[in-house]
């Protein structure tokens, strides 16, 4: 086998390989002979079919298989000999021999991984959120839990904020009905902001059996393009008002949350512990986000291989398609412009290249016990954690997500040891993105 490598660009290479024709013919004949031992043809006993007949029947297929195997094998050997790190898949092309017909020649065009020069992290600054879960945070969570268990009871009085009302409505724009502008027995809780302010405010103070007509101006950026920027006239009839009743924070409420013996203080302690666990996860997520950005910022400019970017684009597109499907949306003709995902795909490929180099240089591969810890943490979100853990370990490919998470944790830990890390006091609501 003879090889030579051509540089076609910063990362693009062409590998030219020539293989003796005799080697291919020998392999084709060897495979045909093996096939003849088991081939069945009418009029011949098994294993007694002449090689010429086997070659006539199976020759083209066997030759094709041999050529493919030779291409792959010799390409792999040539890549090793030339110390090439192939990114993506090569494009194979046969070459017409100019003079020496004793050689089979082909070329493989591909991209290689770029050289990664990691920057100095000593001057990098990272802020670690410092969060204390307060009694007020526990109270806010309790209030959310109470609202999730709210009960409504009919009342004979004008509607006010917090009430659930039942209405029939009909909207007209320029005297004509429009999509979504009509409903019967429609329920909503006043003050939750589900509908436009111009629609909800006139409903306050209405009594059961009362009707009202008013105008609603749709914003120019309203999601319904048919009505965006237009004014509609709504006729509304209110058929019922229900007052909200929140459960008291007592033993019965604690029991409804699964707290043994309805211990209210134990309930508050468990809520606090859950908030602290969630806060710790959010802190780690913010640290990881900063670390990844620091790695991008401190590493010299990287020209990501186009093949890897295309593969990442396909992954992002598939993720988006699955997300749409999980929401019950039709994905038959689903497609997103590549321009929407191009920048994100390039960012992810660059980051992946940096992480790969960092892990290789500093041996940051996760240990089995680290992967196990990630799996067990993921499993806690399910009803039967033990079954979820067993499911992950039943097939190696199911562990890839956990392995990636553990690897990233190792990278974050390593970078935090090198960078300048300062604490930043932060309310829980801000950390959770609620402020």
Curated annotation (Swiss-Prot):
Give its E.C. classification number: 5.2.1.8
Task: Give the Gene Ontology MF terms in alphabetical order.
Answer: peptidyl-prolyl cis-trans isomerase activity; protein folding chaperone; ribosome binding
Class of the enzyme per the UniProt entry, highest EC level: isomerase
One matching Pfam family is Trigger_N
Q: Which InterPro entries match?
A: PPIase_dom_sf (IPR046357), PPIase_FKBP_dom (IPR001179), Trig_fac (IPR005215), Trigger_fac_C (IPR008880), Trigger_fac_C_sf (IPR037041), Trigger_fac_ribosome-bd_bac (IPR008881), Trigger_fac_ribosome-bd_sf (IPR036611), Trigger_fact/SurA_dom_sf (IPR027304)
Keywords (alphabetical) are:
Cell cycle, Cell division, Chaperone, Cytoplasm, Isomerase, Rotamase
* Name of the protein described by the UniProt record: Trigger factor
Source organism of the structure: Nitrosospira multiformis (strain ATCC 25196 / NCIMB 11849 / C 71)
């Amino acid at each position: 086998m003879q090889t030579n490598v051509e540089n076609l660009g910063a990362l693009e290479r062409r590998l030219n390989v020539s293989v003796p024709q005799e080697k291919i013919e020998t392999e084709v004949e060897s495979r045909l002979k093996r096939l003849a031992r088991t081939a069945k043809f009418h009029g011949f006993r098994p294993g007694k079919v002449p090689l010429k007949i086997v070659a006539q029947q199976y020759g083209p297929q066997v030759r094709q298989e041999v050529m493919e195997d030779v291409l792959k094998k010799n390409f792999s050997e040539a890549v090793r000999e030339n110390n090439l790190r192939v990114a993506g898949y090569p494009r194979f092309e046969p070459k017409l021999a100019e003079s020496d017909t004793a050689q089979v020649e082909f070329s493989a065009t591909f991209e290689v991984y770029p050289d990664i020069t990691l920057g100095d992290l000593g001057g990098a600054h990272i802020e670690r959120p410092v969060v204390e879960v307060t009694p007020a945070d526990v109270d806010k969570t309790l209030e959310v839990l109470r609202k999730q268990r709210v009960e409504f009871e009919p009342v004979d009085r004008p509607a006010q904020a917090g009430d659930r009302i039942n209405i029939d409505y009909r909207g007209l724009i320029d005297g004509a009905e429009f999509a979504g502008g009509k409903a019967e027995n429609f329920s909503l809780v006043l003050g939750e902001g589900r509908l436009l302010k111009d629609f909800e405010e006139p409903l306050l103070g209405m009594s059961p059996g009362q009707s009202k007509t008013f105008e609603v101006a749709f914003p120019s950026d309203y999601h319904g393009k048919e009505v965006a920027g237009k004014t509609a006239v709504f006729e509304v009839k209110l058929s019922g008002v229900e007052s909200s009743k929140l459960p008291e924070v007592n033993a019965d409420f604690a029991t409804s949350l699964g707290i043994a013996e309805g211990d209210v203080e134990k309930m508050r302690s468990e809520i606090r512990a859950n908030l602290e666990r969630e806060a710790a996860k959010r802190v780690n997520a913010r640290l990881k986000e900063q670390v990844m950005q620091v790695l991008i910022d401190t590493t010299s400019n990287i020209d990501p291989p186009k093949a890897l970017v295309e593969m990442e684009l396909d992954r992002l597109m598939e993720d988006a398609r699955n997300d749409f499907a999980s929401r019950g949306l039709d994905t038959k003709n689903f497609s997103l412009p590549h321009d929407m995902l191009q920048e994100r795909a390039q960012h992810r490929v660059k980051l992946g290249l940096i992480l790969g180099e960092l892990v290789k240089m500093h041996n940051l591969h996760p240990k089995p016990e680290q992967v196990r810890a990630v799996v067990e943490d993921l499993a806690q979100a399910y009803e039967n954690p033990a079954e979820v853990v067993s499911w992950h370990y039943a097939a190696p490919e199911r562990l890839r997500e956990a392995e990636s998470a553990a690897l990233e944790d190792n990278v974050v830990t390593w970078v935090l040891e090198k960078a300048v890390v300062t604490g930043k006091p932060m309310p829980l609501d801000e950390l959770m993105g609620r402020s």
